[in-house]
Amino acid sequence: MGDVEKGKKIFVQKCSQCHTVEKGGKHKTGPNLHGLFGRKTGQAEGFSYTDANKNKGITWGEDTLMEYLENPKKYIPGTKMIFAGIKKKSERADLIAYLKDATAK
């Protein structure tokens, strides 16, 4: 798996404008990601998801996030996440390592 510290830097640069990770964190443009691993798409309480997100029906984990974060709109056509994705697999692995750590605390 990736490097948590490198992943934190990637999160701050590319994700934190729209997402929070801490327990009880507020939703921004995107949902709070606390408890992400093991949760189905479109299930963060209190966030308004597109039908595409709600109906995707996968459970978030290392493999699903690796594919999603490469090209979100390809993985979930109709998502309102406007992020283009992270092409480098090593950067995605670092981000996932950080998310796995930060969203479980």
Swiss-Prot record:
The modification N-acetylglycine is found at residue 2. Binds 1 heme c group covalently per subunit. GO terms for cellular component: cytosol; mitochondrial intermembrane space. The keyword Iron applies. It is found in: Mitochondrion intermembrane space. It holds the Pfam family Cytochrom_C. Its main location: mitochondrion. Keywords: Acetylation, Electron transport, Heme, Iron, Metal-binding, Mitochondrion, Respiratory chain, Transport. It comes from the Eukaryota. Heme c binds at residues 15, 18-19, 81. GO terms for molecular function: electron transfer activity; heme binding; metal ion binding. Gene3D superfamilies: Cytochrome c-like domain. Disulfide bonds: none annotated. SUPFAM superfamilies: Cytochrome c. PANTHER family: CYTOCHROME C. Electron carrier protein. The oxidized form of the cytochrome c heme group can accept an electron from the heme group of the cytochrome c1 subunit of cytochrome reductase. Cytochrome c then transfers this electron to the cytochrome oxidase complex, the final protein carrier in the mitochondrial electron-transport chain. Belongs to the cytochrome c family. This is Cytochrome c. It comes from Anas platyrhynchos (Mallard).
